[in-house]
Curated annotation (Swiss-Prot):
Keywords: ATP-binding, Chaperone, Cytoplasm, Nucleotide-binding. It comes from Francisella tularensis subsp. novicida (strain U112). Residues 144-163 are annotated as: Disordered. It is found in: Cytoplasm. This is ATP-dependent protease ATPase subunit HslU.
Length: 455
């Protein structure tokens, strides 16, 4: 992350996609900026400064997950979102919490590999074109030229070579312009190693994955001739050439460093592994998961197939609705590891109006763009937008509060007929008015039983 990404810049970027929730945006912006600040310190102090993990508290659909997702994109950091309910205490059937870090490393390796391939794109593209040109214009064989043209002057051989090079360049330009995209050729490609299914005991996913890698590596690099269009052949050849040009060991080393220094783990549904205040006694599946999370959040060393990972400087963002349980129902040790608490507010009508209109790729803009592909110009009156927001808010209040996700349900119902008939519509300019919204959604909202199942 560069120095340019100040907390204000980060918040401004988040506001392009997320409406409201300024406290949460500020908290994550400061946490991200502290990453950069830490990297400016001397080595001794840097090791002592650990990230201040965040606990987001708020109902579903108010932006908790979206904030974390956008933050990871801004930071260009390895990011993984997991649900706390998917894990069980070590020794019980199910995934153990250390698999979070292993999955995070896999994400980082994939990310760094893509970055490395991007750097060699130009060279890989050139090599891929050469492979295609070798098929289209096979180079003259050396042995043939020695036998067949023993008395041929050196000048003639040179001019033939020059002519061949000119022809190749003409065809190279045709390939680059896409003029030969649909022409079929036969090209030699690497055969993907067969994946061997390994059945392992529950919770031993890492071991089974390593065994699969071992069996795959035992299979020799086989090649086979495959018939395909030049367009597809270029893409395949470019991927193969890029894979040869990148240094896998360097990728792994950089991925491990990225995880240790900049990794972000988003723990969703943390409230679902809380012990309810009213319950007495320990709950193995719930409290055990929290106790297993403690070493990860506090800082420990996890073994992965790429190497050892220290979790001391990984940022953990936990979130939960806390409808039934309270944050104080988390075990005290875990509460202490989540020092920054941010409460996200429920969405009001005004928030729904802004969500429909303001984000860069708002719901309305998405539907307008989708209909545009059918030649339909869709527009919404201001009063109609407010009416949609009011309906979404009302259904949330009366049925179940699912936050901004309710807007998707309402919009799908509202535009169902238009979406279905779009290809055959004669009138291509459609303006959504308040009357249209009332006609399509009015009865459903009034009838609570219907809205419960349809909206």
């Amino acid at each position: 992350m560069t120095q340019i990404m100040t907390p204000k810049t980060i918040v401004h970027e988040l506001e392009r996609h997320i409406i409201g929730q300024n406290d949460a945006k500020k908290a994550v912006a400061i946490a991200l900026r502290n990453r950069w600040r830490r990297m400016q310190l001397d080595n001794e102090m840097r090791q002592e400064v650990t990230p201040k993990n965040i606990l987001m508290i708020g109902p579903t659909g108010v932006g908790k997950t979206e904030i974390a997702r956008r933050l990871a994109k801004l930071a260009d950091a390895p990011f993984i979102k997991v649900e706390a309910t998917k894990f069980t205490e070590v020794g019980y059937v199910g995934k153990d919490v250390e698999s979070i870090i292993r999955d995070l490393v896999e994400t980082a390796v994939k990310m760094k590999r893509e970055e490395a391939k991007e750097k060699v794109t130009e060279k890989a593209a050139r090599l891929a074109e050469d492979r295609i040109l070798d098929v289209l214009i096979p180079p003259a064989r050396t042995s043939e030229s020695k036998v067949g043209f023993a008395n041929e002057p050196a000048e003639d051989a040179a001019s033939k070579k020059e002519k061949e090079n000119k022809t190749r360049e003409i065809f190279r330009k045709k390939i680059q312009k896409g003029e030969l995209d649909d022409k079929e050729i036969e090209i030699e490609v690497a055969v993907a190693p067969k994946t061997i299914g390994v059945m392992g005991p529950p919770g031993m996913e890492d071991m089974t994955s390593q065994l699969q890698d071992l069996f795959s590596s035992l299979s020799t690099d086989k090649k086979k001739n495959k018939k395909m269009r030049i367009k597809d052949a270029i893409k395949l050849a470019q991927d193969e050439e890029a894979a040869k040009l990148v240094n896998e060991e360097d990728i792994k080393a950089r991925a491990l460093e990225a995880v240790e220094q900049n990794g972000i783990v988003f723990l969703d549904e943390i409230d679902k592994v809380c012990r309810k205040s009213s319950n007495s006694g320990a709950d193995v599946s719930r409290e055990g998961v929290q106790r297993d999370l403690l070493p990860l959040v506090e800082g420990s060393t996890v073994s992965t197939k790429y190497g050892m990972i220290k979790t001391d400087h990984i940022l953990f963002i936990a979130s939960g609705a806390f409808h039934v349980a309270k944050p104080s129902d988390l075990i005290p040790e875990l509460q202490g590891r989540l020092p920054i608490r941010v409460e996200l507010k429920s969405l009001e009508i005004e928030d729904f109006v802004r969500i429909l209109r303001e984000p860069d790729c708002s719901i309305l803009k998405q539907y307008i763009a989708l209909m545009k592909t059918e030649g339909v110009d869709l527009s919404f009156e201001e009063d109609a937008i407010r009416k949609i927001a009011e309906i979404a808010y009302k259904v949330n209040e009366e049925v179940e509060n699912i936050g901004a996700r309710r807007l998707h349900t309402v919009m799908e119902r509202l535009l169902e007929e238009i979406s279905f008939d779009a290809p055959e519509l004669v009138e291509k300019n459609i303006n959504i008015t308040t009357d249209y919204v009332n006609e399509k959604l009015g009865n459903l909202v009034k009838n609570k039983d219907l809205s419960q199942y349809i909206l």
